[in-house]
């Protein structure tokens, strides 16, 4: 739903991430694998290296993933498992590095914004600190490209997206890719350059019952549905994969959005101005008091995009 990027310069971030590894040793192990599997080497990008696997951009990772998995698809189940296990044992074992990877993402000096699930924006995944000073990680380090299908991208910086357990679980995303072709996959990761779900998709409230009294939607929620106005068809795949329509129409999530729609409809700009005049405060201050835009942005409230969209507030 939102791009997942650090606010520091990319070359600084990459340099910091590479320091987490013995890149020379990983390159040596990779060279051994390429010697052992020349047919795989032949289908991978010519400029592939351990460094590029660790910090290459998502489009590059997609190319590696698609080449590797396409090659394996031509093999028997037994051979596929054997090859993948060989790459895991040969140096590309995410489990051996997962603690330092999650710590890297949580490290405030790396300036990642991790507050709500990047995919759904419904679940709060903010890391918190216990009384004894220990940090508790609430997010899951989700692999956009499955590490089980392609161990080569298992430790790749731009393959990580902090998500909630629901989005990362087997009933939703699991090991699936977002998109079907290499081109689609390369564009649909929140880590991809040009990813723009937030601006290309808008939440809207649809009235299901013609002629229904449209004053207090929260009192008859079944007459309404949360839908998506999709400016670029590609993002429908994200909506479908993460079951966003079902989840935003479920229980308290839907009720909360309808509540704020009601509040906005009762308080159009002319009413806000009247209230501001009565209270002798500026329009902007009154607007903030009613709709909490700055406050919720600062506090990183979940579902804030959807809330603003249904209130028709940019």
Briefly describe each language-model feature range.
Residues 117-120, 164-167:
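Short cysteine-rich clusters marking metal-coordination/redox-active sites
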Residues 103-113, 152-157:
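Short, flexible, mixed-charge glycine/proline-rich loop motifs
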Residues 115-118, 125:
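Extended, Lys/Arg-enriched charged tracts that mediate electrostatic binding to polyanionic substrates
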Residues 2-36, 217-314:
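C-terminal, charged low-complexity interaction regions
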Residues 38, 74, 132-133, 180, ...:
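Intrinsic-disorder/low-complexity loop/linker signature
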Residues 122-159, 173-179, 184-186, 191:
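Histidine-centered nuclease catalytic patch
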Residues 151, 170-236:
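Domain-level detector of nuclease and nuclease-like folds
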Residues 1-105:
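N-terminal accessory alpha/beta regions
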């Amino acid at each position: 739903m939102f791009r997942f990027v650090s606010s520091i310069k990319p070359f600084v971030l990459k340099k910091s991430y590479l320091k987490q590894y013995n890149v020379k040793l990983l390159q040596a192990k990779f060279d051994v694998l390429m010697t052992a599997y020349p047919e795989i080497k032949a289908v991978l990008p010519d400029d592939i290296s351990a460094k590029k696997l660790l910090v290459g951009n998502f489009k590059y990772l997609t190319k590696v993933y698609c080449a590797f998995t396409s090659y394996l698809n031509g093999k028997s189940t037994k051979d596929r498992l054997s090859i993948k296990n060989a790459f895991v044992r040969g140096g590309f074992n995410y489990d051996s590095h997962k603690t330092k990877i999650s710590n890297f993402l949580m490290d405030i000096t790396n300036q990642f914004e991790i507050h709500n699930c990047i995919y759904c924006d419904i679940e709060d995944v903010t890391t918190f600190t216990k009384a004894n000073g220990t940090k508790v990680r609430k997010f899951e380090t989700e692999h956009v490209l499955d590490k089980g299908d392609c161990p080569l991208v298992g430790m790749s910086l731009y393959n990580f997206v902090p998500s909630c357990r629901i989005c990362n679980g087997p009933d939703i995303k699991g090991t699936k890719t977002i998109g079907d072709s290499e081109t689609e996959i390369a564009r649909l990761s929140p880590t991809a350059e040009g990813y723009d779900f937030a601006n290309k998709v808008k939440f809207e409230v649809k009235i299901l019952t013609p002629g229904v009294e449209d004053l207090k939607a929260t009192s008859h929620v079944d007459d309404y549905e949360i839908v998506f106005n999709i400016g670029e068809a590609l993002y429908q795949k994200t909506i479908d994969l993460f079951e966003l329509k079902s989840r935003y129409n479920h229980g308290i999530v839907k009720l909360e959005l309808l509540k704020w729609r009601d509040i906005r409809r009762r308080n159009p700009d002319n009413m806000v101005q009247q209230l501001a005049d009565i209270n002798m405060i500026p329009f902007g201050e009154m607007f903030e008091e009613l709709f909490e835009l700055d406050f919720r942005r600062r506090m990183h409230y979940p579902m804030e995009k959807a809330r603003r969209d249904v209130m028709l507030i940019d």
